[in-house]
């Protein structure tokens, strides 16, 4: 399993050219870890350009942060078993 997030940050060219650093921090509630990336201008903008640059930041998280595939399937099976038990109880109660 692979998870990804894409974020789009619009910056004025003046700020981008200055070499300012921007930090993006992301976390997922079941995960104990936090992903943190620092981005900056990899190369200078065209001279005289006042356009806003768009810089996509892609964060790839490790599937280990969310447990193994077997752990995830086990959680799904537990949820399915609970739903089945509840439905069985309701049907028997109505009869």
UniProtKB/Swiss-Prot annotation:
Protein name per the record: IgNAR transmembrane form NE
Tissue: Expressed mainly in lymphoid tissues including spleen, epigonal organ and circulating lymphocytes. Also expressed at low levels in the pancreas.
TM regions (residue ranges): none
Source organism (scientific name): Ginglymostoma cirratum (Nurse shark)
Presence of the UniProt keyword Phosphoprotein in the record: no
Region ranges (Disordered): 24-79
Any one of the GO CC terms: immunoglobulin complex
Keyword annotations of the record: Adaptive immunity, Glycoprotein, Immunity, Immunoglobulin, Immunoglobulin domain
GO biological process per UniProt: adaptive immune response
PROSITE patterns linked: IG_MHC
Biased amino acid composition, Basic and acidic residues: 41-56
Record domain Ig-like: where: 1-36
InterPro entries: Ig-like_dom_sf (IPR036179), Ig-like_fold (IPR013783), Ig/MHC_CS (IPR003006)
Source superkingdom: Eukaryota
Composition skew (Acidic residues), residue ranges: 61-77
Known glycosylation sites: 81
Compositionally biased region (Polar residues): 24-35
